[in-house]
């Protein structure tokens, strides 16, 4: 190829003709874009554009018309030029190229969201080529066209290039699929999907959001949708395919890594290539520094280099920085995208697995463990991708550094390499210790988190039993003696590792320089250019040496997480063939469900399990029949229903099911949604049948009471509802589903007696709504048995008898006959909580209208209504995040602070750290960085002396001082790290955590009932983690980088005083960028935290209702809901880490300007006659470090603000309103109080919360010692509120309660609650031993506990357990039946020495035989005590001394049973009549 200065191609006017003088450089430049487009354009069209659908809406794309017009101008120009010059070959090629460009533009814009890369690069190359031709080509005035063609091409290419990179406004939607998404979700498509290559490199696509966020506070709705490639539903398809075909078949978690990489191998390759190219570019800088130092040094000699060489090197430094920044930010961005994809895939896989988990696998893992897999472990794997590829890049950087060092110092580099590799074993040892400590710490955190979860879930019982201090001490022991002690060890190991990594470059440089002196000291000079080039290489070498051990440790930590996730994903699943499914049987008495010789257990095959739970079961249920299952507590009634659902391990036999199933669990599972959404459960609303359903389930009256009716937000686990309301909503959900088979687990135990009868009449009776369906009911209620077509009686997991009610009741040998004979005078309908709890929005019933539905009187059945259909959206509920507005009865939205965090929060945190320790930290960090600068200044002085003298005087003296400076610098910086990350962090986190847990335990019950459990636990997990480990580390790096920048700028200003002119404008530019970025990034970070809570809450909620979800075949709907929540969080997170890249590329551009300025002023100073190569080398070696330091300071300033929010949130809880004091020293009740048990309510009124109506209104009652009082009333009358009032879970509005003549508000809560005994509605149990559950204070002996267990009919069961009193109770008492947990509550009462006992339906969940035993025990053991019995079954209080009748929160009757029954106008008489006792 020939250059233009040697050969002129324009002779004779034919400027593109290569036939005259040969093919030239400009000819190639002119033709290259055409050839590029012909090849790449055709390939991209056939492989990308042609496969897509076309939406030809030209009128909406004005850029098409503009580009078409410009291309027409170019075509006309070239055709005319071809005609004038008679040159056809090159013009024809250009004409063909422009026709191809026109065609591609026409099909491009309505088809692709982003410009075709081939077209974009074509116009860029064409623009540069025409500019180059205009600059280098001679100006021939003889041939005007020779100027016209490149000039027109130049301007037309520029227009097309600008039109091609044009991005549509953010408020415009251009494509039909985007419009559909906008209509469905309300979210605008991500600007990323419209971004061209330049916009993606510069992250300009994010600028509209940054601008909006700078001027406004961002909300979730402002965030754009997630790009389609990042959505969990799309990612899961590929993951599950590869998981099934690879990892699932193997027996090692290593294959799971393979699946994760296999899913995104193309992206992985791109990331690695980007990082390696960036490494190569980064190592150009030391060579440029050396050349600039040599250039400056040349002006101290007789042969200075031309000035343009120096300025060119300065420009090269700037361009190298810019290119390196672009590559590095793309590497980080794609790494985060890969991590986000992994997290999405793992979360969705864990969620899907949890829906299929077998009972044995589920029992071996607590809810907290599974949630940790989803939250903690997936995040660890995700975070790994940020620096994972340093494993490849690190060795490559070390090789590059040592290779460059070899060229500079010869074999001296080998000693540096030796020291480098010598440090690896040390780092590996530190990493292994760190990993071991981290694993222990994870277990400590899990234990604390699990224990805290139990405290919050059982807080009502803890307060009622006055156990706050016991649980507090246990929690603080887990926290302070285990977790914080391990945190201190981790901090010390981390500090030792930091010192090693900081000192490594000093050791390497000392070894390198020392070897150089030994080998070449007499022949070569350790000059300035060698020293600072080496120094720059040592700085580059510090990153891989520092990061490799950290990355190895992170990989090991992530491997542990992957192993845990892999173990979960490969755990046992439900046997899909356990139940054989067939279409619905439409025959009038056709078999709907049948079990033949079935044996079932809760443990899987091959496990060391006890005897099967159910044995030799033969069971048949037919269409149109009501089948009842009866038996004592723990005999297997609920297990039989679970076996019908396929949730138990089937060992033998077969289960057949015909049609769909509806299931109502014994413990109703209620979604955190509206009542209507709970009933519809993802089905379309049928107004007529919906009204029929709520009438049949006796819910109309409840809707009248609730402020928002069926649109009431029920809160987490239905906390704003009573037990009876939960049960009827669960029942209504089953009825509304219009299924073929109904499995109802003891639903009648949760309602009042008159409601019980209505439900039987409306639903289960011969004229009930479900009479045409197959209904299977487990029950302890003998009343409903009269309606049963078939009764099965269970004992010890076997069906001991079955038959119709007539058959069994007429047989003297029948077990059922014996029960009927013994309890024929008792109504055994049971209940566990019909009264409204503390969190009701309203307790006063405004109407006593009989709600007996028309369903009970009509001929309607479920069969008369069409089958239910699932909503088109597949959504259970609308609400996703706490940002949505909630109704008056819903839970309050989580408070999200906006704007800057108040300085008071920082001050409080620093005081918690200790101001003296903070002072020491600043002393150490400033001294360390100053000493580091001194190290390099000394190196500069040493090299200058060598250069001036021409040899190496006193080399070991200079080397020793250099090493000493480096050692002191590393020691001081490490001490600063130890001070802030260990001593300050532990001191502050102990104060904040302990204060918060004390405040939460002392908070009133209203706080727990208006705050979701997940939100509280988030404070004790995520926020505590940030205070423990993140905040101190962020502060450390922030101040280290800040002082580093200050010292660097000082060095640059000292070496180049003219640089001070730029400091002010650069500072304002930097500050503006920081503020511009901080506002948006801070809000995105907060939104990220807010959108994570609903994701974890949904997961926890789903784990609590697995049986219900599977029974209704709603797995796909809940999976879809989970995917939506994952994507909701990820679209915020995607914008957050993209905003980091947006900021980094702009701040690092400022850093590149600093580097350029340092180099430029150094060159300029040399050219003007003031050369100082030592100062220039020193300033440049520091300037190249400032680029990332500037970025880190901005980033960490945001990290400081976003993480200090955790302190703010903890302080918010520390400042929670508190209950009354536990103990009032001046008002301690006397020993043995209450000694009599006299209770007096004196004009007592109370409401649950402010702005709510009174639930008890002017109650005046005098209860004598040892008197037995029955408390009755309709639903919502205020019965259970009396319990809350007596225990002061709610405080009076007016009036008071006196207990043995002491006003209970005048004494401490612990003194009051510990002197009362209660058997509450909620039969809560704690994880631990039986003994710890019964007597956590350890006040009773084993003999006393056994005696109490015997009285509570639990002794025989406990004795069958392997550990006896020390047998383990699993989380929430899951390994105990509901009745057994209720009897444990009775045992606690028996162990409490008190004169007052409150029973809130103590035997609701037990069978009638056990009920009789318990009632006898209460009469015998508590005969000398005052007993208040809140009754939902009227028969349980018929032997009371007096009956207290409540209505609308007022006392309407209070007299003996006999007198009230004699008065037929009394409310008690009507209640007794409704219950069938009269």
Swiss-Prot record:
Q: What domain of life does the UniProt record list for this protein's source?
A: Eukaryota
Where ATP 2 binds, per the record, is at: 1273-1280
Tell where it localizes: Vacuole membrane
UniProt note: phenotype after gene disruption: Cells lacking both abc2 and abc4 show sensitivity to cycloheximide (CHX) and 4-nitroquinoline oxide (4-NQO), and decreased accumulation of monochlorobimane-glutathione (MCIB-GS).
Sorted alphabetically, the keyword list is: ATP-binding, Detoxification, Glycoprotein, Membrane, Nucleotide-binding, Phosphoprotein, Repeat, Translocase, Transmembrane, Transmembrane helix, Transport, Vacuole
What are the annotated glycosylation sites?
Answer: 86, 139
UniProt-recorded Gene Ontology molecular function terms: ABC-type phytochelatin transporter activity; ATP binding; ATP hydrolysis activity; ATPase-coupled transmembrane transporter activity
Every copy of the ABC transmembrane type-1 domain together lies at 268-557, 918-1202
- An annotated GO cellular component: membrane
Record topological domains on the Vacuolar side: 1-25, 86-90, 138-154, 281-310, 409-411, 517-539, 932-968, 1055, 1169-1172
Question: Locations of Low complexity compositional bias?
Answer: 841-863
Transmembrane domains' residue ranges: 26-46, 66-85, 91-104, 117-137, 155-175, 260-280, 311-331, 388-408, 412-432, 496-516, 540-560, 911-931, 969-990, 1034-1054, 1056-1076, 1148-1168, 1173-1193
> Per its UniProt entry, what is the enzyme's top EC class, as one word?
translocase
Q: Does the keyword Repeat apply?
A: yes
Q: Where is the composition biased (Polar residues)?
A: 829-840
- The segment annotated Disordered runs over 828-867
Function field: Involved in vacuolar sequestration of glutathione S-conjugates. Together with abc4, required for accumulation of a red pigment (ade pigment) in the vacuole of a mutant affected in the adenine biosynthetic pathway.
What's the protein called, per UniProt?
ATP-binding cassette transporter abc2
């Amino acid at each position: 190829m020939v250059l233009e200065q040697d050969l002129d191609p324009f002779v004779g006017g034919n400027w593109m003709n290569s036939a005259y003088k040969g093919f030239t450089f400009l000819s190639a430049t002119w033709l290259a874009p055409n050839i590029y487009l012909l090849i790449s354009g055709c390939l991209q069209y056939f492989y990308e554009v042609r496969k897509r659908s076309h939406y030809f809406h030209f009128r909406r794309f004005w850029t098409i018309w503009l580009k078409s017009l410009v291309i027409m101008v170019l075509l006309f120009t070239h055709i005319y030029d071809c005609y004038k010059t008679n040159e056809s070959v090159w013009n024809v090629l250009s004409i063909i190229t422009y026709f191809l460009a026109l065609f591609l533009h026409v099909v491009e814009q309505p088809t692709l969201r982003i410009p075709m890369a081939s077209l974009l690069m074509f116009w860029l190359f064409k623009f540069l080529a025409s500019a180059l031709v205009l600059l280098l080509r001679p100006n021939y005035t003889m041939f005007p066209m020779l100027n016209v063609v490149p000039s027109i091409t130049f301007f037309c290419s520029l227009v097309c290039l600008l039109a091609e990179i044009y991005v549509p406004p953010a408020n415009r939607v251009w494509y039909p699929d985007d419009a559909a998404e906008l209509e469905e979700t309300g979210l605008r498509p991500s600007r990323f999907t419209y971004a061209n290559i330049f916009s993606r490199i510069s992250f300009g696509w994010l600028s509209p959001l940054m601008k909006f966020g700078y001027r406004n506070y961002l909300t979730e709705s402002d965030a754009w949708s997630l790009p389609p490639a990042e959505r969990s539903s799309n990612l899961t398809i590929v993951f599950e395919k590869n998981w099934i075909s690879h990892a699932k078949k193997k027996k090692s978690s290593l294959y799971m890594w393979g699946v994760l990489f296999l899913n995104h191998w193309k992206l992985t390759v791109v990331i690695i290539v980007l990082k390696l190219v960036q490494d190569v570019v980064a190592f150009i800088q030391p060579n440029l520094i050396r050349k600039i130092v040599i250039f400056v040094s040349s002006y101290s000699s007789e042969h200075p280099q031309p000035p343009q060489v120096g300025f060119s090197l300065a420009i090269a430094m700037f361009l190298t920085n810019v290119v390196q920044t672009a590559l590095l930010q793309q590497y980080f961005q794609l790494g985060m995208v890969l991590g986000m994809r992994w997290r999405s895939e793992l979360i969705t896989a864990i969620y899907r697995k949890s829906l299929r988990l077998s009972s044995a696998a589920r029992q071996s893992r607590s809810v907290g463990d599974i949630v940790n897999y989803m939250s903690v472990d997936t995040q660890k794997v995700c975070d790994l991708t940020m620096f994972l590829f340093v494993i490849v890049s690190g060795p490559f950087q070390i090789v590059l550094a040592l290779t460059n060092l070899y060229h500079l110092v010869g074999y001296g580099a080998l000693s540096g390499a030796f020291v480098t590799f010598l440090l690896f074993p040390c780092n590996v040892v530190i990493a292994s210790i760190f990993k071991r400590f981290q694993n222990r710490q994870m277990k400590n955190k899990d234990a604390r988190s699990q224990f805290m979860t139990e405290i919050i879930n059982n807080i009502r019982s803890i307060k009622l039993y006055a156990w706050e201090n016991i649980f507090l001490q246990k929690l603080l022991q887990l926290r302070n003696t285990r977790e914080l002690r391990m945190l201190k060890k981790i901090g010390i190991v981390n500090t030792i590792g930091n010192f090693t990594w900081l000192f490594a470059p000093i050791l390497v440089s000392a070894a390198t320089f020392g070897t150089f002196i030994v080998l070449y000291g007499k022949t070569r000079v350790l000059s300035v250019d060698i020293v600072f080039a080496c120094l720059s290489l040592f700085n580059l070498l510090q990153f891989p040496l520092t990061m490799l051990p950290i990355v190895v440790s992170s990989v090991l930590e992530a491997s542990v997480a992957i192993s845990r996730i892999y173990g979960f994903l490969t755990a046992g699943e439900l046997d899909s063939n356990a139940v054989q499914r067939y279409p619905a049987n439409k025959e009038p008495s056709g078999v709907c469900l049948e079990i033949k010789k079935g044996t079932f257990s809760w443990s899987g095959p091959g496990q060391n399990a006890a005897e099967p739970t159910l044995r030799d079961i033969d069971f048949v249920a037919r269409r149109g029949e009501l089948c009842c299952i009866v038996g004592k507590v723990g005999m297997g009634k609920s297990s039989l229903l679970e076996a019908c659902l396929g949730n138990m391990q089937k060992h033998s036999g077969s289960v057949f099911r015909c049609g769909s199933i509806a299931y109502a669990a014994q413990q109703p599972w209620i979604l955190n949604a509206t009542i209507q959404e709970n009933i519809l459960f993802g089905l379309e609303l049928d107004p007529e049948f919906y009204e029929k359903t709520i009438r049949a389930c006796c819910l109309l009256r409840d809707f009248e009471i609730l402020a928002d009716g069926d649109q009431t937000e029920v809160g987490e686990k239905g906390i704003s509802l009573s037990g009876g309301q939960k049960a009827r909503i669960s029942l209504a959900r089953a009825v509304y589903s219009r299924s073929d088979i109904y499995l109802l687990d003891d639903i009648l135990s949760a309602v009042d007696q008159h409601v019980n009868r209505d439900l039987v009449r409306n639903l289960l009776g011969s004229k009930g709504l479900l009479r045409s369906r197959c209904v299977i009911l487990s029950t302890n209620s003998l009343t409903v048995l009269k309606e049963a077509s078939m009764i099965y009686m269970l004992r010890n997991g076997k069906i001991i008898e079955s038959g119709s009610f007539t058959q069994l009741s007429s047989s003297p040998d029948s077990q059922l006959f014996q029960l009927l004979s013994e309890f024929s005078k008792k109504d055994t309908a049971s209940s566990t909580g019909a009264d409204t709890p503390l969190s009701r929005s309203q307790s006063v019933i405004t109407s006593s209208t009989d709600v007996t539905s028309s369903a009970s009187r009509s001929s309607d059945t479920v069969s008369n209504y069409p089958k239910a259909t699932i909503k088109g959206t597949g959504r259970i509920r609308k609400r996703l995040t706490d940002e949505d507005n909630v109704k008056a009865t819903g839970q309050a939205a989580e408070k999200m602070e906006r704007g800057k965090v108040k300085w008071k929060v920082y001050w409080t945190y620093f005081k918690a750290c200790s101001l003296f320790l903070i002072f020491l930290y600043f002393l150490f960090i400033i001294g360390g960085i100053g000493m580091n600068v001194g190290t390099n200044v000394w190196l500069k002085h040493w090299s200058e002396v060598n250069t001036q003298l021409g040899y190496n005087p006193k080399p070991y003296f200079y080397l020793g001082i250099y090493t000493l400076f480096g050692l002191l610098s590393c020691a001081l910086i490490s001490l600063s790290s130890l001070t802030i990350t260990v001593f300050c962090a532990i001191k502050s986190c102990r104060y904040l955590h302990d204060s918060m847990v004390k405040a939460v335990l002392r908070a009133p019950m209203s706080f727990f009932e208006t705050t979701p459990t997940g939100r509280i636990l988030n404070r004790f997990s995520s926020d505590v983690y940030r205070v423990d480990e993140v905040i101190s580390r962020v502060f450390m790096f922030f101040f280290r980088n800040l002082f580093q920048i200050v010292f660097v700028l000082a060095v640059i200003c000292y070496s180049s005083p003219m640089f001070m002119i730029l400091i002010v404008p650069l500072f304002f530019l930097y500050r503006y960028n920081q503020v511009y970025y901080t506002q948006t990034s801070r809000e995105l970070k907060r939104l990220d935290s807010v959108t994570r809570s609903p994701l974890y809450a949904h997961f926890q909620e789903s784990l609590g209702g697995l049986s219900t979800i599977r029974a209704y075949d709603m797995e796909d709907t809940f999976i879809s809901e989970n995917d939506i929540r994952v994507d909701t969080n990820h679209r915020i997170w995607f914008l957050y880490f993209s905003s980091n890249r947006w900021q980094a590329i702009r701040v690092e551009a400022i850093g590149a300007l600093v580097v350029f300025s340092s180099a430029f002023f150094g060159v300029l100073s040399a050219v003007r006659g003031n050369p100082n190569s030592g100062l220039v080398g020193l300033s440049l070696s520091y300037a190249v470090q400032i680029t990332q330091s500037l970025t880190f300071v901005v980033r960490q300033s945001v990290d400081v603000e976003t993480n200090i929010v955790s302190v703010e949130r903890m302080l918010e809880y520390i400042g929670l309103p508190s209950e009354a004091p536990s103990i009032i020293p001046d008002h301690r009740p006397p020993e043995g109080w209450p000694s009599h048990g006299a209770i007096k309510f004196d004009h007592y009124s109370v409401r649950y919360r402010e702005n709510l109506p009174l639930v008890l209104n002017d109650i005046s009652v005098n209860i004598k010692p040892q008197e037995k009082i029955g408390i009755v009333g309709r639903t919502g009358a205020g019965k259970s509120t009396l319990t809350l009032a007596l225990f002061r879970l709610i405080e009076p509005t007016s009036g008071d309660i006196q207990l043995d003549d002491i006003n209970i508000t005048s004494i401490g809560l612990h003194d009051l609650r510990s002197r009362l005994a209660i058997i509450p509605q909620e039969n809560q149990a704690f994880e631990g031993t039986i003994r710890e559950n019964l007597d956590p204070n350890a006040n009773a002996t084993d003999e006393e506990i056994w005696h109490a267990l015997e009285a509570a009919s639990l002794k025989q069961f406990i004795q069958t357990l392997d550990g006896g009193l020390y047998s383990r109770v699993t989380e929430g008492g899951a390994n105990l039946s509901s009745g057994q947990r209720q009897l444990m509550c009775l045992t606690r009462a028996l162990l409490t020495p008190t004169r007052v006992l409150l029973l809130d339906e103590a035997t609701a969940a037990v069978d009638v035989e056990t009920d009789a035993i318990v009632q006898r025990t209460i009469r015998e053991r508590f005969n000398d005590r005052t007993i208040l019995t809140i009754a939902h079954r009227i028969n349980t209080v018929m032997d009371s001394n007096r009956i207290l009748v409540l209505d609308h929160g007022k006392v309407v009757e209070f007299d003996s049973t006999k007198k009230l029954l004699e008065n037929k106008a009394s409310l008690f008489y009507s209640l007794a009549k409704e219950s069938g006792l009269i």
